[in-house]
Amino acid sequence: EVMGIPLKEPGFYVVELASPRLGSALLGAERPYYVQTTALVTNLSVHLKLGREASLVWVTSLDKAQPVVAAAVEVRDCDGRVHWKGKTDAQGIARIEQPLPNVATLPYCFRNWDRKYFVTARTDGDFSFVFSDWNEGINPWRFHLPTGGYNGPFLATSVMDRTLLRA
């Protein structure tokens, strides 16, 4: 059963629906089945790029795919502690020109291994967010790209070629 929910204003909504049809199909009785979900109604898209020495947040509009100027941006952990706040520039970019704490040192969110940043963007009348670990649908393995779990300070690649060794 698919149905639209008439949420007319931007915001983050927590919704509970009662479905008699699902109740009779899933519960085997004539009573409603309750389904809870959340819905984000927004015209903002928030993009996060974490770096070791600096990071950035890019905010764009969904309807025009244009940068959003002067959006208020906050970077928080799951305890709600603010690690950075600022505004986007003319290109819709908020430049975080300082190292953020390593994700491994953040307080956990839902499980002991689940640590992430929660980044919000606000404009007059609109709000959106992104978590630093959201990658559903763009996982590297889907595109046959190699991945690894190294978080150290240095990464080196060796190039070995016979012509290089002959010198």
Model-derived features with residue positions:
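N-terminal, cleavable Sec-dependent signal peptides of secreted/periplasmic/extracellular proteins
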Residues: 1-167
